[in-house]
Protein backbone atom coordinates (compact mmCIF):
# COMPACT_ATOMS: atom_id res chain seq x y z
CA UNK A 1 0.00 0.00 0.00
CA UNK A 2 1.32 3.45 -0.90
CA UNK A 3 2.49 5.76 1.89
CA UNK A 4 0.59 8.59 0.18
CA UNK A 5 -2.65 6.82 1.04
CA UNK A 6 -1.97 7.53 4.73
CA UNK A 7 -2.26 11.24 3.98
CA UNK A 8 -6.03 11.02 3.76
CA UNK A 9 -6.84 8.43 6.44
CA UNK A 10 -9.07 10.50 8.70
CA UNK A 11 -12.08 12.80 8.74
CA UNK A 12 -11.98 16.43 9.87
CA UNK A 13 -15.09 18.60 9.49
CA UNK A 14 -15.65 22.27 10.28
CA UNK A 15 -18.90 24.15 9.94
CA UNK A 16 -20.51 27.42 10.89
CA UNK A 17 -24.23 27.76 11.50
CA UNK A 18 -25.51 31.10 12.69
CA UNK A 19 -22.76 32.18 15.11
CA UNK A 20 -21.73 28.67 16.17
CA UNK A 21 -18.50 27.21 14.72
CA UNK A 22 -17.64 23.55 15.35
CA UNK A 23 -14.65 21.45 14.30
CA UNK A 24 -15.00 17.68 14.59
CA UNK A 25 -12.51 14.86 14.10
CA UNK A 26 -12.62 11.11 14.29
CA UNK A 27 -10.12 9.27 16.48
CA UNK A 28 -8.69 6.60 14.20
CA UNK A 29 -5.01 6.38 13.29
CA UNK A 30 -4.31 3.92 10.49
CA UNK A 31 -1.13 2.71 8.85
CA UNK A 32 -1.97 1.00 5.61
CA UNK A 33 -4.89 -1.27 6.39
CA UNK A 34 -4.13 -1.55 10.11
CA UNK A 35 -5.78 0.50 12.86
CA UNK A 36 -3.03 1.62 15.25
CA UNK A 37 -5.16 3.72 17.58
CA UNK A 38 -8.85 4.53 17.87
CA UNK A 39 -8.73 7.42 20.37
CA UNK A 40 -6.31 9.89 18.77
CA UNK A 41 -6.84 13.60 19.31
CA UNK A 42 -6.54 15.42 15.97
CA UNK A 43 -7.75 18.82 17.16
CA UNK A 44 -5.69 21.48 18.91
CA UNK A 45 -6.56 24.94 20.21
CA UNK A 46 -4.36 28.02 20.19
CA UNK A 47 -4.67 31.73 21.01
CA UNK A 48 -6.54 31.09 24.27
CA UNK A 49 -9.00 28.70 22.56
CA UNK A 50 -9.95 31.31 19.95
CA UNK A 51 -8.44 29.30 17.08
CA UNK A 52 -8.94 25.58 16.52
CA UNK A 53 -6.82 23.44 14.23
CA UNK A 54 -7.66 19.99 12.87
CA UNK A 55 -5.12 18.06 10.86
CA UNK A 56 -5.09 15.06 8.54
CA UNK A 57 -2.11 13.19 7.19
CA UNK A 58 1.09 12.16 8.85
CA UNK A 59 0.79 12.83 12.58
CA UNK A 60 4.36 14.07 12.90
CA UNK A 61 3.94 16.33 9.87
CA UNK A 62 0.64 17.67 11.16
CA UNK A 63 2.16 18.51 14.53
CA UNK A 64 5.16 20.17 12.85
CA UNK A 65 2.83 22.36 10.79
CA UNK A 66 0.70 23.08 13.85
CA UNK A 67 3.79 24.34 15.70
CA UNK A 68 4.74 26.57 12.75
CA UNK A 69 1.18 27.94 12.58
CA UNK A 70 1.22 28.61 16.31
CA UNK A 71 4.39 30.68 15.88
CA UNK A 72 2.76 32.68 13.07
CA UNK A 73 -0.37 33.22 15.18
CA UNK A 74 1.78 34.68 17.96
CA UNK A 75 3.83 36.72 15.48
CA UNK A 76 0.73 38.26 13.87
CA UNK A 77 -1.31 38.87 17.05
CA UNK A 78 -3.86 36.07 16.49
CA UNK A 79 -4.72 37.30 12.97
CA UNK A 80 -5.64 33.91 11.51
CA UNK A 81 -5.86 34.88 7.84
CA UNK A 82 -2.51 36.69 7.82
CA UNK A 83 -0.87 33.87 9.80
CA UNK A 84 -2.20 31.23 7.40
CA UNK A 85 -1.01 33.15 4.33
CA UNK A 86 2.45 33.63 5.85
CA UNK A 87 2.63 29.93 6.75
CA UNK A 88 1.58 29.05 3.20
CA UNK A 89 4.39 31.23 1.82
CA UNK A 90 6.88 29.39 4.02
CA UNK A 91 5.32 26.05 3.06
CA UNK A 92 5.79 26.77 -0.67
CA UNK A 93 9.31 28.17 -0.34
CA UNK A 94 10.90 25.77 2.15
CA UNK A 95 12.23 22.43 0.85
CA UNK A 96 11.62 20.74 4.21
CA UNK A 97 8.05 22.00 4.58
CA UNK A 98 7.16 21.03 1.00
CA UNK A 99 7.83 17.40 1.93
CA UNK A 100 5.37 17.39 4.80
CA UNK A 101 2.29 15.29 4.11
CA UNK A 102 -0.49 16.99 6.01
CA UNK A 103 -3.52 19.20 5.55
CA UNK A 104 -5.15 21.42 8.13
CA UNK A 105 -8.48 23.07 8.77
CA UNK A 106 -8.18 26.15 10.95
CA UNK A 107 -11.02 28.30 12.24
CA UNK A 108 -11.68 31.33 14.36
CA UNK A 109 -14.81 33.48 14.77
CA UNK A 110 -14.32 35.05 11.32
CA UNK A 111 -12.70 32.44 9.09
CA UNK A 112 -12.72 28.77 8.20
CA UNK A 113 -9.59 27.92 6.20
CA UNK A 114 -8.14 24.82 4.57
CA UNK A 115 -4.35 24.73 4.34
CA UNK A 116 -3.17 22.15 1.80
CA UNK A 117 0.09 20.32 1.31
CA UNK A 118 0.74 22.48 -1.74
CA UNK A 119 0.77 25.65 0.34
CA UNK A 120 -2.74 26.72 -0.63
CA UNK A 121 -5.03 28.69 1.67
CA UNK A 122 -8.67 28.07 0.77
CA UNK A 123 -11.70 29.69 2.38
CA UNK A 124 -14.55 27.33 1.47
CA UNK A 125 -18.01 28.37 0.40
CA UNK A 126 -21.19 27.52 2.30
CA UNK A 127 -19.49 27.70 5.74
CA UNK A 128 -18.46 24.02 5.59
CA UNK A 129 -15.03 22.45 5.10
CA UNK A 130 -13.77 18.88 5.37
CA UNK A 131 -10.52 17.03 4.74
CA UNK A 132 -9.31 13.45 4.87
CA UNK A 133 -10.54 10.19 3.42
CA UNK A 134 -13.99 10.65 4.94
CA UNK A 135 -14.05 14.36 4.19
CA UNK A 136 -16.30 14.23 1.14
CA UNK A 137 -18.85 12.08 2.99
CA UNK A 138 -18.89 14.46 5.97
CA UNK A 139 -18.97 17.53 3.72
CA UNK A 140 -21.91 16.20 1.69
CA UNK A 141 -23.88 15.23 4.78
CA UNK A 142 -23.22 18.56 6.50
CA UNK A 143 -24.24 20.61 3.48
CA UNK A 144 -27.45 18.62 3.09
CA UNK A 145 -28.31 18.87 6.78
CA UNK A 146 -27.58 22.60 6.85
CA UNK A 147 -29.88 23.12 3.88
CA UNK A 148 -32.83 21.07 5.10
CA UNK A 149 -32.65 20.76 8.88
CA UNK A 150 -33.08 24.27 10.26
CA UNK A 151 -33.81 23.02 13.77
CA UNK A 152 -30.42 21.30 14.22
CA UNK A 153 -27.51 23.06 15.94
CA UNK A 154 -24.03 23.17 14.43
CA UNK A 155 -22.92 20.55 16.94
CA UNK A 156 -25.79 18.19 16.00
CA UNK A 157 -25.07 18.61 12.28
CA UNK A 158 -21.36 17.95 12.84
CA UNK A 159 -22.04 14.80 14.87
CA UNK A 160 -24.55 13.39 12.36
CA UNK A 161 -22.23 14.19 9.45
CA UNK A 162 -19.19 12.64 11.12
CA UNK A 163 -21.15 9.48 11.94
CA UNK A 164 -22.22 9.18 8.29
CA UNK A 165 -18.58 9.57 7.24
CA UNK A 166 -17.48 6.94 9.77
CA UNK A 167 -20.13 4.54 8.46
CA UNK A 168 -18.77 4.90 4.92
CA UNK A 169 -15.01 5.43 5.34
CA UNK A 170 -12.97 2.50 6.65
CA UNK A 171 -10.18 4.87 7.72
CA UNK A 172 -12.45 6.86 10.08
CA UNK A 173 -14.26 5.80 13.23
CA UNK A 174 -17.13 6.85 15.49
CA UNK A 175 -14.90 8.19 18.27
CA UNK A 176 -15.81 11.79 17.46
CA UNK A 177 -14.18 14.72 19.24
CA UNK A 178 -15.61 18.20 18.77
CA UNK A 179 -14.36 21.65 19.69
CA UNK A 180 -16.33 24.88 19.58
CA UNK A 181 -14.71 28.16 18.58
CA UNK A 182 -15.23 30.69 21.37
Curated annotation (Swiss-Prot):
<keyword id="KW-0479">Metal-binding</keyword>
<dbReference type="InterPro" id="IPR022281">
    <property type="entry name" value="ATP-dep_Prtase_HsIV_su"/>
</dbReference>
<keyword id="KW-0888">Threonine protease</keyword>
<keyword id="KW-0021">Allosteric enzyme</keyword>
<dbReference type="InterPro" id="IPR029055">
    <property type="entry name" value="Ntn_hydrolases_N"/>
</dbReference>
<keyword id="KW-0963">Cytoplasm</keyword>
<comment type="function">
    <text>Protease subunit of a proteasome-like degradation complex believed to be a general protein degrading machinery.</text>
</comment>
<keyword id="KW-0378">Hydrolase</keyword>
<dbReference type="GO" id="GO:0051603">
    <property type="term" value="P:proteolysis involved in protein catabolic process"/>
</dbReference>
<feature type="binding site">
    <location>
        <position position="169"/>
    </location>
    <ligand>
        <name>Na(+)</name>
    </ligand>
</feature>
<dbReference type="Pfam" id="PF00227">
    <property type="entry name" value="Proteasome"/>
</dbReference>
<dbReference type="InterPro" id="IPR023333">
    <property type="entry name" value="Proteasome_suB-type"/>
</dbReference>
<dbReference type="GO" id="GO:0004298">
    <property type="term" value="F:threonine-type endopeptidase activity"/>
</dbReference>
<comment type="similarity">
    <text>Belongs to the peptidase T1B family. HslV subfamily.</text>
</comment>
<comment type="subunit">
    <text>A double ring-shaped homohexamer of HslV is capped on each side by a ring-shaped HslU homohexamer. The assembly of the HslU/HslV complex is dependent on binding of ATP.</text>
</comment>
<protein>
    <recommendedName>
        <fullName>ATP-dependent protease subunit HslV</fullName>
        <ecNumber>3.4.25.2</ecNumber>
    </recommendedName>
</protein>
<feature type="binding site">
    <location>
        <position position="172"/>
    </location>
    <ligand>
        <name>Na(+)</name>
    </ligand>
</feature>
<feature type="active site">
    <location>
        <position position="10"/>
    </location>
</feature>
<dbReference type="InterPro" id="IPR001353">
    <property type="entry name" value="Proteasome_sua/b"/>
</dbReference>
<dbReference type="GO" id="GO:0009376">
    <property type="term" value="C:HslUV protease complex"/>
</dbReference>
<keyword id="KW-0645">Protease</keyword>
<dbReference type="GO" id="GO:0005839">
    <property type="term" value="C:proteasome core complex"/>
</dbReference>
<feature type="binding site">
    <location>
        <position position="166"/>
    </location>
    <ligand>
        <name>Na(+)</name>
    </ligand>
</feature>
<keyword id="KW-0915">Sodium</keyword>
<dbReference type="GO" id="GO:0046872">
    <property type="term" value="F:metal ion binding"/>
</dbReference>
